[in-house]
Amino acid sequence: MKQQYKTKKPLIILTGPTAVGKTKLSIELAKAVNGQMISADSMQVYRHMDIGTAKIRPEEMQDIPHYLIDVLDPWESFDVVRFQTMAKEALEKIYTAGAIPIVVGGTGFYIQALLYNIDFDENDSETGYRSELQSFADRHGVEALHDRLRQVDEKSADMIHPNNIKRVIRALEFYHQTGTRISEHNETQRQKESPYRFVYFVLDDERERIYRRIDQRIDQMLD
């Protein structure tokens, strides 16, 4: 088992709340271990969305490659499945370059999906049923659609915000297709052994200090 672990490819995870200091630490870490970055942020992937996303500035990158930043236009869709695909492509480029990937960000669901290679079973979809759910939401509102999810999968309903209609529909769609709650499916996937030899760092700080840094960052963005 120990020998098998050693043969796995290395992966570093660096996460934590906004303004805790991930960017600065990630750069120093990359210099120390010959690392390259993969952003696990659901908004920094978009171009033209610098304000409010705390996106790293080009001068801060210090010539260290950063993947999944400024690669999509705002009207393009981005979800955990697309993140997983793009992040795996970035991983292969980093490993080929002889470097160590450092996944940085605050979207924990995305990180777990990559770390444990979660299968979201997105291949089959019933367009008719999806359209029916979308029409229901248009007529009755997102809260009513979310209530339908709660009736069949309370755990998913607790985890998914009513306004995240795409994920609500996907959860209902999955239950309709398989008779299994997507929360149960995902939990099973999370119990899989990771294909990576990873270390997982979660940064934290006093709340007041984080809030002060957030205020300072907003002021800088708006100057």
Give names to the regions the model predicted:
Residues M1-D223:
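Phosphate/pyrophosphate-binding catalytic cores of soluble transferases and nucleic-acid-acting enzymes
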